[in-house]
Structures are given as C-alpha cells and as structure tokens.
Amino acid sequence: MAIETAIFAGGCFWCMVQPFDSLDGIEKVRSGYTGGHVENPTYEQVLTHTTGHTEAVKIWFDSEKISYRELVEIYWEQTDPTDAMGQFQDRGDNYRPVIFVNSPEQREIAEESRAALAASNRFDEPIVTKIEDAKPFYEAEEYHQDFYKKDPEREALEMAQRLQFKADKWN
C-alpha cells in the first residue's frame, strides 16, 4: 500500500466528497479549507472572504489501486473549469476551482491534464482552473464531514446544478 494525498477545490466541499469517497483505493476524504493566510479558520471566517481560503477536499489514496492522474480526471468532471469565481450556485473566491499539488510529479500530471482538456474543445470558454502548490489544509468542522451521508436531501439540492452541468458537458 502506497498512501498519497490529493487536494482539490471545486466549489462547495459537500459536493466534492461523494464522487471520490466510493472509489476503490480511496482511504479517506475530508472537507476543509486551504490556500489562505489564516491558521485554523472556521467556516464562518472563510465565508467572510477575508481568509484567502477556499473550500477543498483532501483525499488519501492508495496509488497502487488508483492513480493521481485518474483522480484529476474525475475532478474535472465534478467542476466547471471555465468559472474562476465559484462553482454553480456557490459564488466567491472561497469556492474557486484549484488543484493543489503536493509534488513536481503531481504538478506535471495536473498541467498535462489541464492542457489536454483545453485542447479537447469540450468548452467554449478558456479553462481557468488554477494549479497551485499545496498549502496547509485545515479540516472543516465535523458537521461538514461526509455531509452527503448526514443530509442526503440537502446534498441533492446542492448537487442539482452540478449534475445537470455534468450531464450536458461530460455525457
């Protein structure tokens, strides 16, 4: 077993857990905040747009069962990579799409994948998802963890626009 981590920001972190959580080779997925300048921020602080943080998920995966490249491909299908200031109904810099990389290898994979997506002409607008070096990841409050299991009806409401976009662009 070779456990590695991936950090993806793609709008509301509630909507980013389930697509990864059920995959073979995923050990754990946690919602949290990263990319900012405030240590141990709270949800309320992040909502003020003054911390620099974005909502994200940190994924612990067994790279012998699922590759980082596969995770990046799954990530693209969960987001609108042409929207730099939020995702779907969630607006603002705390919902911006970012792939946070932990190594030069992850950066190379993410950049190659972004270039391939741009060249695919799947989207009419340019791909604006950022690729940034990973910064400290602060786990969100417990009530945010595994939200799709705790409140499936609310999760379904949050996911509606995302799922329609996915059906339109990826199927």
Swiss-Prot record:
Gene3D superfamilies: Peptide methionine sulphoxide reductase MsrA (3.30.1060.10). The active site is at C12. InterPro entries: Met_Sox_Rdtase_MsrA_dom, Met_Sox_Rdtase_MsrA_sf. Keywords: Oxidoreductase. Transmembrane segments: none annotated. The keyword Oxidoreductase applies. One of its GO terms (molecular function) is L-methionine:thioredoxin-disulfide S-oxidoreductase activity. It catalyses: L-methionyl-[protein] + [thioredoxin]-disulfide + H2O = L-methionyl-(S)-S-oxide-[protein] + [thioredoxin]-dithiol; [thioredoxin]-disulfide + L-methionine + H2O = L-methionine (S)-S-oxide + [thioredoxin]-dithiol. GO terms for biological process: protein modification process. Its EC number is 1.8.4.11. Disulfide bonds: none annotated. It comes from the Bacteria. Pfam families: PMSR. HAMAP family: MsrA. Belongs to the MsrA Met sulfoxide reductase family. Has an important function as a repair enzyme for proteins that have been inactivated by oxidation. Catalyzes the reversible oxidation-reduction of methionine sulfoxide in proteins to methionine. This is Peptide methionine sulfoxide reductase MsrA. The gene is msrA.
